[in-house]
Amino acid sequence: MPNSVTPRPMSSRRQWLVAIGLVAITVVLAALRYSPWRLVWNITPSEPRGLYLVHVTGPVPVSHLPYGALVQFHYSCPLIPARVTRGPLAGITRLTCLDRHVAPYPDGTPFVKRVEGKPGDILTTRRGCVTIRRRDGTVRALGCALRRAPDGRPVPYHMHWNDTRIPRGQFYAGSTRVPQSYDSRYFGLVRRQQIIGTVQPVWTTAKRY
C-alpha cells in the first residue's frame, strides 16, 4: 500500500502574501468598475489581438477624434431592402437587418475600429472599392467590399457612396489591416451617439502595419 503524503500547511508568510494579492486584485477590479477605464481583450483580426484600455467618454465631438484613432462604439445593424419570398407577403420588399447575411452581431455589440473618415471628407465607391478624399486633399483607399464572407456565404449588400460628404456628427469606421474587416463598407457611417470611448493598446501580439 503506497505511503500517504500529508500536504504541508501553508506558512503564515505565504498566507499573508496570498491574502494581500487577493485584496489587491479586489481593489483593482472595484476601481475599474467605477472608473472611466475598461480593459477589453480583442480577438478579431481587424486590430492585433491583445489587451486594450478603453477610456469611457461617451459621445464626443467627432472633430476631436484624430485620423487613425481607435474608437469603441455600439454597433447598429443597418437595414437593407429585401424581397419577401414566402408567405402572404411574398413579393413585397421590406427592410431587413444586414447582419443576417454578413455577420450575426446584435445591436449594441461593442466594436473597435479606427477613424478613417471625418465630417467634410468625401466618400466614393467604384466597383465595390471605397476611396476617401479628405479635407486636406489627400486621397486614401479604404478597401473593397467582399463578394463572399470569410465562411463562404455570399455578401449581397454593401454601402455605395457617390461622392458623398460625411455629415456632421458621423465618421467612417474602418480597418485597412485585413481585407475581411467588417466595417463601414457594410454597416455605414457611425454616429457620435454610438461612441463608447477611445482605445489604447496595452499589450498585443503584433504590430499594426
Mark where each language-model region is.
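Protein maturation boundaries and topogenic segments
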Residues: 1-110, 185-209
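Short hydrophobic-aromatic micro-motifs
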Residues: 52-54, 72-73, 124-125, 167, ...
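Short, flexible surface segments
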Residues: 66-70, 119, 167-168
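Solvent-exposed loop/turn segments at secondary-structure junctions
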Residues: 78-79, 123, 130, 178-180
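Mid-length scaffold segments of soluble, non-membrane domains
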Residues: 105-141
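Short amphipathic beta-strand/extended segments with alternating polar/hydrophobic composition
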Residues: 137-151
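Acidic/glycine-rich C-terminal interaction modules and beta/coil loop segments
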Residues: 149-199, 203-207
